[in-house]
């Protein structure tokens, strides 16, 4: 089902002429003021479970109506929203059921199905006044949940003022990243923002990083040598970061038995779509994070206060989430992904809050290292926030001092998840949409559920557990890096990855055959110094070789001709210091070039180039 929801000053219609599928009705005209107008197209997929799509549609309409504080709803059949319409009979039944379900709490006007109608509408024109929704037949877990309506604030870390978010606040926001994150949280969609394919999808194919695997399930990728190298370097980076901060690496299974009550309850609490299947008499699931294995491991440990805070870390290769096919978007949303996952056992809330703060700064450091600045949102239950305001304001103040930015604060009236507090950090893609990456969460449920205890003398203490992904999934990190590379082109800079992550850091290009031997010696020296360098020995023109190096995003392009051989000074194009139409060139000795590249990558992880040194024998994967 496709819907378009318009917050309207009024909607007025008049049925003019029947079609052959028109319903018989006496309601041939009508008008409703101060209403939510819901244009609806019933689709073929809805026929598989009409009850579910009715329930999901009503839930969405109620949520929107309550947010807008309206009590009048117009249900308006509008076939033009879809090219895959369901049968007229099913559409009539579904529309009538939606009207029936809404009528108990709202004044409902339903326009007739199958008539040519004239209508007039006046849209209010505020940020939430036009919303489009795709309603599916997915049946959500039948768990009675109290409706939770959050309040959102902007926290100014300089004067520690909280400003509740409203239309005026949104209209005056200057921080584009924070505004994008806030609009995502408030479900504010902008026309034209979601059109087309994100640039990173083009890049992953064009640069031979990765691609969809057609013989697997949707949302699963094949990784080519360059992409595998980038993933491995990112994995090395997180490993080093976590171990430096006291994390102990472990490895746990990817599959779990849902007959274990703790695992089943935690899986249900998480709420994301999961890969579940039956094998023999067992109901099994593929993990969506490393929580399950790490919690079972902690349950079996004899933990003492002196062990706290205890940090276990796993690079979960892979984690699985059964996302809807229509929601799969390149590396941003997929079904199999690599998640760095650390869980910290803390003896009490005081220690948990200290660890939370440490891990917040660790997460923010990753944005600095990747050169992908984050917008952040803190989320707390109301009770937790009121008890710990000063602690929060201290973090907000330090964040403002370090980054010069405000943050979003979400206050939940009650706890609806296993956590009482969390922080999410996001980069913004080229469409102005957030890519949520690092997160830290304060979990107050899982220790009890899994039977994790700390032995404190004669007492058994149930600890607090922090969930932390210092970077978010490796795939999303790469997504953010590639989207950021595209955004650089809008500022007249060539797209590039940080040098330590670029597969080919340097390429040596001889002008002619007589320069080839010297050029090969230079490439060999670079590789001996731990630099990923190759040598372009192909039978192409000089111009094409230089263009190919640009297409490959090579950070340092070394051209060797007569003058370079005579002077031993190499002509080097430095990509990250260049403009789109103006290359930045330097004259460097081999030793100076090695020193410059080594200084560029600093203490970042290093791996050799997993391709032949000679370009002529490097295979083409796409």
Curated annotation (Swiss-Prot):
Top-rank taxon, per record: Archaea
Subcellular location as annotated: Cytoplasm
Spans annotated as Catalytic: 199-498
Residues that bind Zn(2+): 291, 343, 467
Cofactor binding note: Binds 1 zinc ion per subunit.
Keywords assigned by UniProt, alphabetized: Aminoacyl-tRNA synthetase, ATP-binding, Cytoplasm, Ligase, Metal-binding, Nucleotide-binding, Protein biosynthesis, RNA-binding, tRNA-binding, Zinc
Protein's GO biological process: threonyl-tRNA aminoacylation
Listed InterPro entries: aa-tRNA-synt_IIb, aa-tRNA-synth_II, aa-tRNA-synth_II/BPL/LPL, Anticodon-bd, Anticodon-bd_dom_sf, DTD-like_sf, Thr-tRNA-ligase_IIa, Threonyl-tRNA_syn_edit_dom_arc
Gene Ontology molecular function, alphabetical: ATP binding; threonine-tRNA ligase activity; tRNA binding; zinc ion binding
Domain notes: The N-terminal domain is an archaea-specific tRNA-editing domain that hydrolyzes incorrectly charged L-seryl-tRNA(Thr). Catalysis of tRNA editing is performed by the charged tRNA itself.
PANTHER family found in the cross-reference section: THREONINE--TRNA LIGASE, CHLOROPLASTIC_MITOCHONDRIAL 2, THREONINE-TRNA LIGASE
Purpose: Catalyzes the attachment of threonine to tRNA(Thr) in a two-step reaction: L-threonine is first activated by ATP to form Thr-AMP and then transferred to the acceptor end of tRNA(Thr). Also edits incorrectly charged L-seryl-tRNA(Thr).
Homology family: Belongs to the class-II aminoacyl-tRNA synthetase family.
The name this protein goes by in its record: Threonine--tRNA ligase
Organism: Methanococcus maripaludis (strain C5 / ATCC BAA-1333)
